[in-house]
Amino acid sequence: MMRSLAIFSTLLLLVLWAGSGVAGPEQGIFEVRIKDHREAIDDFSRLILTVDKVVISPKPGLKFWQTSWKEFSASPASVDLTKYIGKDSAKIFRADIDVGAFDGFHLKIKSLEGFLKKAQLNAPVKNTIGPVKLSFDIAPRGETVLVLDLTVIDFSDHPPRGYELSLKGYELYRNGKLVDKIPPG
């Protein structure tokens, strides 16, 4: 009796061990692209944006105290925004990440280097992009693409302000289909 109980216990443990943790968490593709909305970008011959990190915030669940922003490195790290105006966009991040619901996004910019066309001088550009409240899901074996529409605005007629980079809007695609757009249109 003891021997059959030991064999049964061993087999039960092997079955439980084999079924647990073999497959990792499901993943989906998350891609971030940037483009410039035509405002004061025409003043520049080049505007190099260096991205530090792409950061997303999971929606808080039952363990809300364990929820923290997830950081990802951008690749390529530097993009010349003058080359991505209108419908053209630059891919700055693409990776498989764990599925889930998210409610925030932040594009952390390390530096901005602008060179003016007419004056042939470097021009400082202030980054005003901060965290954005944005609900989206990463589905298993699906693709979520976020296209950020940035804009450079000329405030030089309001000294001491100069050029500023801000977020004009975004487009959110799920499996190639547009699901959200701000501003609408």
Which residue ranges define each predicted feature?
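Positively charged n-region of N-terminal signal peptides that target proteins for export
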Residues: 1-5
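Bacterial N-terminal signal peptides
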Residues: 9-16
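A short, compositionally biased domain-edge/stem linker segment
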Residues: 16-22
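A short, solvent-exposed, low-complexity linear motif enriched for acidic/polar residues
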Residues: 22-185
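Generic hydrophobic-segment detector
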Residues: 8-9, 131
